């Protein structure tokens, strides 16, 4: 199965368009319709060139108390040589459109759609869009919570297409969960997973 990911492109609604999309925030979750991610609600971060973003979650925004999540929109030749300004923050990148060049630990990784990277604190990573097309990805950030006697986790760079999803029991193969980190690996204090529902799944 080839995954398809949604990536916002911005723009403005037509003046004759009926606007019925509504975002819903609760203490447990948020539903953000794609039509709400327009040019007028983009933000910018320091040290990022030719890049804008949509803030999906930030600490104390209802359902989010410990993490932030952005959808990054990087133009050709854009990116950052100093993307993370918090030495205590860990991050996950997930590519939904385009190609990213990630440099970390003296290695260069070319990440395409479905690409996943876990970046522990103080990784010193950089990310550039070295193509002629737009790059869009999710960036999830969280302050790492160390535990005495447990080492910090290592960098992970992989792709969703290289990991077989775990099918949930009694779902006839219609509900799968792709895990990038084993739940028993207690070096990790957060997990980003992909849940897939096939038609007919509940």
Predicted regions and their residues:
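Glycine- and acidic-residue-biased ligand/ion/polar-headgroup-sensing regions
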Residues: 76, 88-101, 105
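A short, N-terminal "cap"/entry segment at the start of jelly-roll beta-barrel domains
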Residues: 2-66, 132, 136-191
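Short acidic-glycine-tyrosine-enriched beta hairpin
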Residues: 92, 105-121
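Conserved short histidine dyad/triad with adjacent acidic residue
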Residues: 50-59, 68-87, 180, 193-202
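Well-ordered beta-strand positions in beta-sheet-rich domains
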Residues: 71, 108-110, 124, 194
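Asparagine-centered strand-capping/turn motif at beta-strand->loop junctions
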Residues: 127-131
